[in-house]
């Protein structure tokens, strides 16, 4: 299991691989025993990524399946706000930088999405090679390692 993010007093857990599911669990250090009836806020089995991790921006959770189905959920309730398809396959986890979400595909595409309750594609970029590794942020730059290159992406 991968604990990727927390939302207020909850941990968001992605089981990954096999039959992945995403669970929101109330963080309670005093809890003991079986807490499934008292501390599980929501549990989702559809459109959950096997490899990449979800990301929370504001009150929204964003994730993409390995096959490119991008979904936005309300982080508190787990209810879907919207879903859309991005071509390609995805292993790299999304990142949030400069007020936008970045999704890098195994085919070398970078989709830039504006966060919010509606799907809003800001731009689509094609790079020379595909991405398996998750990008990193340093200062105002995004570093993304493809199969053949290391990219530095920054607004100048």
Where do the protein language model's features map onto the residues?
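Noncatalytic, solvent-exposed loop/strand surfaces
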Residues: 4-156
């Amino acid at each position: 299991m991968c604990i990727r993010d927390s939302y207020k007093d909850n941990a968001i857990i992605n089981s990954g691989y096999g039959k992945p599911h995403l669970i929101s669990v109330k963080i309670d250090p005093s809890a003991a025993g079986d807490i499934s009836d008292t501390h599980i806020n929501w549990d989702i089995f559809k459109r959950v990524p096997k490899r990449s991790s979800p990301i929370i921006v504001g009150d929204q959770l964003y994730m993409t399946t390995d096959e490119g189905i991008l979904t936005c959920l309300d982080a508190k309730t787990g209810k879907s706000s919207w879903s859309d398809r991005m071509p390609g396959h995805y292993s790299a986890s999304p990142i949030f930088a400069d007020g936008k979400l970045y999704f890098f595909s195994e085919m070398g595409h970078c989709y830039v999405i504006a966060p919010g309750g509606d799907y809003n594609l800001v731009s689509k970029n094609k790079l020379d090679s595909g991405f398996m590794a998750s990008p990193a942020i340093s200062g105002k730059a995004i570093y993304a390692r493809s199969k053949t290159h290391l990219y530095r992406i920054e607004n100048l």
